[in-house]
């Protein structure tokens, strides 16, 4: 631009800079930056964020800048792909001014050098490396900066370098005798620092022709670069001022580099600032020559490229802030941590936690780090610090501050702790700790909890303090903790705080000791006072969980406070916990008292702890009593219980050998054995043995576990114990429970009362009361009668009397327990409120039409009394998928991702082709007055009828036979005319295996033995213009094929609809679930092949469990929530196939339980229906017919658990000569009735609610009738048995003569076994039976 510009520039600004900036569109003036006279610099704002605007105010004479606009645009394009460079991204030339615009960066290298925490040597080398690399990239592209200095080097918060403010427009050469030119163009910060190469200053004798070669060179930039690098390593000290540079040019001054300890680094800078431009090293040679010397090898091989990848925004990022970029960086570093350690040559001595090591849940500290690529380990400081980790730490800390989701901040805590292992103790406290403390203010309680835990673990790693950090606890950490605890109300956070507080107290004491060694004055009293206040807040916290957490970690805190303060502060509060209604708190107190007893000493143990524990033996919670007995044994093993207390302790606790709880008895026995070990033979036989002898069946000589355990006397049964507690609570006029005062307390200072005895009676040393010593009132005698009715032997009354002090106290304490409210923490209590989002559902693509035909009606074939092949039926293609739109308008990427992942379950209402939903017929509960009149006898089928299905509205029913023929029958026609022919016939490819209707729809599925699956729709059209002779309108039925699928090479054994899906089982032991929309396999379960092929299956109403029956008589129970085979069972002595499994409706009850039973036929050769309890794996009820001998058969119904690998099959079962006498068909009738068909062609209606109301509906026994009775054969098993008796002669030929058994026609009864049963509820209640001979009989 010429040196004359400095002469033309005005000394005072005539117009405010904001006016010049306002000239620019979309840019708003913010504030001035610097005081330069050449380029006025301001900070502005545009739609991308903050920017820097440099304004060149043109002199009045005018100035043409078009040439420089082109040059700067060319420079921008050349440097566009250089990562560490920020050229001007916009250059504007106007009439009044020129504008240079670039992005704003908060910090320059000049500022960063003087900001804490100060740069470590590795960070300085990293900045220098990037700066040299940036200059090298520019020079390789033929572009030169012209004004490299620390003010023109920008730094991010993670120390990424950007070289900016390129100045090719500034004068190349300056007069050596006019400093004002230098000050105008280059000394913009008024620091009087000169980094301009000395050859750019011209002396008086310099020829003018030399000035005409107006071109920057790389050596000029290298000199400025060397000065900038030197300033970086000299902690801000500059190499040259302008006068010093003039002297340096003349050889009269040598800059001092003595502050740089590294010889290689010092030599590198000297090579860069050499007075002779030709001897200066190039940027490329500098990086090459000093590789592995000044700059570590991993700068070149890994770190530079890796940091560029982390710093470069991804393509999908939008907006200026790019918060999602911080999430991406954290995730990337988290997954790459193992690789990063390897590339940075970090070798940590990991305290590895093996996979089989189970860490107790209460041990929050020490933590175990589990990061991808890194062995799980407990953090510990490295013997050799690895400062290279600071570079990764810087970008991690920046990303953590700006991440959008709490999960990434928690991952950042993991990474901070991992990286802190590589750092020095000073760096841990200066770099890592402040960020963890800052997270205590995070809105997420998970992040707060992580911050507490990781902060504690980090402080545990510190073994050395600097003088700067000696007051870190009293002045920084403790005030933060006090503020945090006072504002934290959540139960979870207070639990975590209570867990880490003892560890922090111990660490604070360690820091205090280190501070004393450094000669610093730290007040220990104030330090302990702060922890005392925090501890008291937790000890009196209304939330039991916080107190429990503190108790589990109380020993470190006690060691900090010392014996006296532990007694005064901790123990005085803890003993009140035994009166707390929360049994978990009482248990936690007892578990912690052992270690605390060792610390506080024998005096506190005898005066406070031991008497309280003895009183706790009568706690209403049995788990508390178990823990008290365990504590007594452990205290005795440690020698903390003196001899004089041991006998009293045994006398008090030995009565508990009569307690029904086995853990209490075992705890008492363990205490007894522990005490015996410390006694001499004399003390044992003279003092101890008389106390415990009444509680053993036999005389014992060895007091060890193997001898004593088998000899313990039989305890009080649980039922008697519970009834005794009720007796103690309700008895008013009682002598048994009447107490009398004692003159003096017991050795433990309590229990100054005992129970009333008969006159002249006295309790022995053992405390055992004999039966003749027990007084009873008339009311007591009544209660004793109740005990006898419950199986109590009156000769054992002494056991209750001996234990009545315990029973009485337990009864009283239970009656005083307040009703506890639900302690669950709701989301609203945590400050999380629901947000309602509505979804709109629409088809993603249109449903295709029919495959053939020009119209919808053209595709329906009416098949009347004729057979058609499957190919003649129409096919419809699948419906489309479901597209969902929601009303959420926010931009949170995690919520959006969650909403996108929501899958809506397909419902059949979305598919019109399955027909509209129709109401199902209502099942009438109660006794059925069955007449037994044969209404219709149908014989159209020429093959065995294998399946029977009644439509949901009971307008028609379907039958399928072994020849593959499906027939449709009109119920109304049968009811009116008594005879009928099938209305529609469909031919399948092979034997029809099963037919099932889709729930509440006129669509059904038929499966064949060869694996063919077809879904049909039944269309019923009533024509009012055409009427039958009886006046009812004619109905036309037609069947359309909707879906078909073939399982090649498979044979189907059973089939059921599960909501909108179809489940089929095959002989290859598979259960396959099809999606009805497209008949694609949605899920597949492979049952163990060794259990046999699947014969039947069913699910519960909530579809949470599945029961499968197999050909080997095995029942396989699946938990569908986890898709796991949980159990496998079979009956004890037989392995007959399971024929049929039905899960009854929700209203079915057995033993007042519901939704856990299945009705099973098979598994045995008996004519029986089993009610099986899947929750217990046992038979609950057995419904036997007359043909079964109950006395011999009942033992066969014990259920055994089967291993998944079991393949044994009873050969006797496979014998062909064994007659099959099992139930042939079963169907539910309402929720508490079911019908079964027996092998002898009879039909029985079983009433599970009132067993005696069961009846035989169809029977060949003309002069006999059935009666039903039930008997409890096992505690968990009831047998309901049919008994056939001869009818009363007066009833023969009477009104009941019209039963089916009384008709004499040959076709009244079935000649072959019945294969299907159905009950029509309307218009008349009728019974449909089909058999293996192809006959259909309908009765009313």
Swiss-Prot record:
Keywords: ATP-binding, Endosome, Golgi apparatus, Kinase, Lipoprotein, Membrane, Myristate, Nucleotide-binding, Repeat, Serine/threonine-protein kinase, Transferase, WD repeat. Residues 27-303 form the Protein kinase domain. HEAT repeats lie at residues 432-470, 570-608. ATP binds at residues 33-41, 54. It is a lipid-anchor. GO terms for molecular function: ATP binding; protein serine kinase activity; protein serine/threonine kinase activity. WD repeats lie at residues 940-979, 987-1026, 1089-1128, 1133-1182, 1218-1256, 1309-1340. It catalyses: L-seryl-[protein] + ATP = O-phospho-L-seryl-[protein] + ADP + H(+); L-threonyl-[protein] + ATP = O-phospho-L-threonyl-[protein] + ADP + H(+). Its EC number is 2.7.11.1. Transmembrane segments: none annotated. GO terms for cellular component: endosome membrane; Golgi apparatus; late endosome; nucleus-vacuole junction; phosphatidylinositol 3-kinase complex, class III, type I; phosphatidylinositol 3-kinase complex, class III, type II. GO terms for biological process: late endosome to vacuole transport; macroautophagy; protein targeting to vacuole. It is found in: Golgi apparatus, trans-Golgi network membrane; Endosome membrane. It comes from the Eukaryota. The active site is at residue 147. A lipid is attached at residue 2 (N-myristoyl glycine). Involved in glucose-induced micropexophagy and ethanol-induced macropexophagy. Required for ATG2 recruitment to a perivacuolar compartment. Belongs to the protein kinase superfamily. Ser/Thr protein kinase family. PANTHER family: PHOSPHOINOSITIDE 3-KINASE REGULATORY SUBUNIT 4. This is Putative serine/threonine-protein kinase VPS15. It comes from Komagataella pastoris (Yeast). The gene is VPS15.
């Amino acid at each position: 631009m010429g040196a004359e510009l400095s002469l033309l520039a005005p000394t005072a600004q005539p117009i405010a800079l904001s006016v010049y900036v306002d000239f620019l569109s979309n840019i708003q003036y913010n504030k001035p930056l610097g005081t330069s006279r050449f380029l006025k610099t301001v900070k502005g704002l545009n739609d991308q964020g903050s920017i820097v605007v440099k304004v060149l105010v043109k002199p009045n004479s005018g100035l043409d800048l078009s040439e420089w606009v082109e040059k700067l645009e060319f420079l921008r394009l050349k440097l566009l792909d250089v990562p560490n460079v920020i050229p001007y991204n916009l250059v504007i030339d106007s009439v009044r001014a020129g504008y240079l615009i670039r992005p704003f960066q908060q910090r320059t290298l000049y500022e960063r050098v003087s900001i804490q925490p100060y740069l470590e040597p590795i960070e300085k080398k990293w900045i220098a490396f990037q700066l040299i690399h940036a200059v090298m990239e520019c020079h390789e592209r033929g572009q030169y900066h012209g004004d490299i200095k620390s003010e023109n080097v920008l730094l991010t918060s993670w120390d990424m370098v950007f070289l900016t403010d390129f100045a090719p427009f500034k004068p190349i050469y300056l007069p050596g005798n006019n400093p004002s030119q230098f000050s105008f163009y280059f000394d913009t910060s008024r620091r009087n620092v000169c980094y301009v190469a000395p050859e750019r200053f011209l002396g008086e004798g310099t020829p003018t022709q030399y000035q005409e070669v107006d071109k920057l060179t790389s050596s000029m930039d290298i000199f400025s670069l060397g000065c900038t690098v030197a300033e970086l390593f000299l902690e801000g000290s500059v190499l040259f001022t302008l006068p010093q540079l003039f002297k340096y040019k003349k050889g009269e001054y040598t800059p001092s580099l003595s502050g740089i300890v590294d010889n290689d680094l010092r030599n590198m800078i000297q090579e860069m600032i050499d007075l002779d431009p030709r001897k200066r090293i190039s940027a490329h040679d500098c990086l090459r020559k000093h590789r592995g010397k000044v700059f570590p090898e991993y700068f070149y091989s890994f770190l530079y490229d890796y940091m560029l990848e982390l710093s470069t925004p991804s393509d999908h990022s939008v907006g200026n802030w790019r918060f999602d970029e911080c999430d991406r960086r954290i995730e990337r570093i988290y997954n790459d941590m193992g690789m990063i350690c390897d590339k940075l040559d970090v070798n940590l001595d990991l305290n590895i936690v093996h996979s089989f090591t189970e860490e107790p849940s209460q041990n929050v500290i020490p933590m175990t780090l589990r990061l991808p690529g890194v062995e799980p380990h407990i953090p510990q400081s490295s013997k050799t610090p690895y400062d290279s980790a600071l570079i990764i730490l810087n970008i991690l800390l920046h990303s953590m501050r700006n991440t959008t989701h709490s999960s990434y901040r928690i991952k950042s805590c993991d990474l901070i702790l991992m990286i802190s292992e590589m750092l020095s103790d000073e760096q841990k406290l200066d770099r890592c700790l402040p960020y963890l403390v800052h997270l205590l203010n995070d809105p997420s309680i998970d992040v707060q909890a992580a911050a507490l835990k990781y902060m504690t673990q980090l402080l545990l790693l510190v073994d050395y303090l600097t003088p700067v950090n000696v007051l870190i606890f009293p002045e920084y950490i403790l005030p933060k903790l006090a503020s945090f605890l006072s504002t934290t109300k959540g139960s979870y956070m207070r639990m975590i705080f209570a867990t880490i507080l003892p560890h922090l107290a111990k660490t604070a004491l360690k820091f205090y000791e280190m501070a004393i060694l450094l000669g610093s004055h730290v007040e220990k009293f104030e330090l302990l006072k702060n922890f005392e206040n925090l501890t008291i807040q937790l000890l009196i916290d209304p939330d039991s969980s916080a107190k429990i957490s503190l108790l589990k970690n109380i020993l470190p805190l006690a060691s900090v406070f010392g014996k006296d303060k532990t007694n005064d502060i901790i123990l005085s509060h803890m003993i009140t916990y035994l009166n707390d209604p929360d049994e978990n708190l009482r248990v936690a107190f007892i578990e912690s008292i052992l270690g605390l007893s060792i610390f506080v000493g024998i005096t506190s143990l005898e005066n406070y702890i031991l008497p309280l524990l003895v009183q706790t033996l009568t706690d209403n919670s049995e788990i508390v009593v178990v823990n008290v007995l365990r504590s007594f044994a452990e205290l005795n093993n440690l020698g903390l219980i003196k001899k004089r207390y041991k006998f009293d302790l045994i006398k008090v606790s030995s009565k508990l050998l009569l307690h029904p709880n086995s853990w209490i008895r075992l705890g008492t026995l363990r205490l007894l054995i522990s005490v015996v070990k410390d006694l001499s033979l004399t003390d044992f036989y003279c003092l101890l043995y008389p106390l415990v002898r009444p509680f053993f069946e036999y005389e014992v000589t060895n007091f060890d576990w193997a001898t004593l355990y088998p000899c313990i006397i039989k305890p009080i049964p649980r039922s008697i114990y519970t009834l005794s507690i009720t007796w103690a609570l309700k008895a008013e006029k009682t002598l048994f429970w009447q107490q009398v005062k004692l003159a003096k307390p017991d050795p433990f200072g309590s229990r100054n009362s005992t129970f009333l005895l008969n006159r002249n009676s006295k309790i022995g040393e053992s405390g055992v009361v004999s039966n003749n010593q027990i007084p009873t009132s008339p009311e007591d005698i009544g209660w004793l009668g109740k005990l006898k009715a419950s199986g109590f032997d009156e000769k054992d009354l002494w056991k209750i009397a001996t234990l009545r002090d315990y029973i009485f106290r337990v009864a009283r304490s239970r009656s005083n327990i307040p009703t506890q409210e639900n302690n669950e923490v709701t989301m609203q209590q945590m400050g999380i409120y629901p947000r309602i989002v509505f979804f709109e559902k629409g088809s993603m693509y249109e449903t295709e039409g029919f495959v053939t035909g020009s119209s919808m009606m053209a595709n329906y074939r009416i098949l009347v009394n004729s057979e058609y092949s499957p190919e003649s039926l129409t096919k419809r293609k699948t419906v489309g998928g479901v597209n969902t739109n929601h009303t959420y308008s926010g931009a949170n990427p995690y919520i959006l991702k969650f909403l996108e992942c929501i899958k809506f379950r397909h419902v059949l209402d979305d598919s019109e082709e399955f027909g509209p939903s129709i109401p199902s017929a209502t099942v009438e509960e109660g006794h059925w007055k069955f007449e037994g009149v044969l209404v219709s006898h149908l014989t159209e089928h020429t093959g065995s009828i294998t399946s029977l299905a009644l439509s949901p509205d009971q307008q028609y029913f379907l039958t399928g036979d072994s020849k593959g023929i499906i027939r449709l029958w009109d119920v109304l026609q049968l009811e009116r005319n008594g005879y009928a022919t099938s209305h529609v016939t469909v031919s399948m490819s092979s034997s029809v295996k099963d037919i099932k209707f889709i729930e509440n729809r006129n669509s059904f599925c038929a499966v064949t033995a060869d694996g063919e699956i077809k879904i049909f729709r039944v269309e019923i059209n009533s024509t009012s213009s055409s009427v039958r002779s009886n006046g009812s309108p004619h109905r036309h039925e037609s069947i359309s094929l909707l879906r078909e699928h073939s399982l090649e090479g498979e044979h189907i054994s059973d089939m059921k609809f599960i909501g909108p899906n179809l489940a089929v089982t095959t002989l290859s032991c598979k259960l396959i679930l099809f999606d009805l929309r497209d008949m694609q396999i949605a899920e597949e379960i492979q049952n163990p092949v060794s259990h046999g092929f699947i014969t039947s299956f069913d699910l519960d109403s909530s579809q949470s469990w599945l029961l499968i029956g197999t050909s080997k008589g095995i029942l396989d129970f699946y938990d569908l929530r986890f898709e796991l085979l949980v159990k496998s069972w079979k009956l004890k002595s037989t392995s007959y196939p399971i024929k049929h499994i039905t899960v009854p409706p929700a209203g079915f009850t057995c033993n007042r339980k519901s939704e856990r039973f299945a009705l099973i036929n098979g598994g045995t050769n008996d004519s029986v229906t089993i009610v099986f309890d899947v929750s217990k794996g046992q038979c609950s009820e057995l419904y036997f017919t007359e043909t079964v001998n109950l006395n011999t058969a009942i033992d066969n119904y014990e259920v055994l658990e089967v291993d998944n690998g079991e393949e044994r099959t009873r050969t006797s079962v496979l014998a062909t000569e064994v007659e099959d006498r099992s139930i042939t068909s079963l169907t539910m009738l309402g929720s508490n009735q079911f019908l079964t068909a027996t092998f002898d062609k009879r039909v029985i209606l079983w009433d599970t609610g009132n067993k005696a109301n069961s009846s035989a509906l169809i029977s060949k026994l003309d002069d006999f009738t059935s009666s039903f009775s039930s008997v409890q054969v096992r505690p968990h098993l009831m047998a309901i048995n049919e008994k056939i008796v001869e009818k009363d002669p007066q009833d023969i030929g009477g009104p009941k003569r019209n039963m089916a058994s009384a008709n004499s026609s040959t076709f009244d009864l079935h000649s072959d076994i019945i294969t299907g049963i159905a009950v029509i509820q309307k218009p008349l209640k009728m019974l449909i039976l089909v058999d293996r001979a192809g006959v259909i009989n309908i009765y009313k």
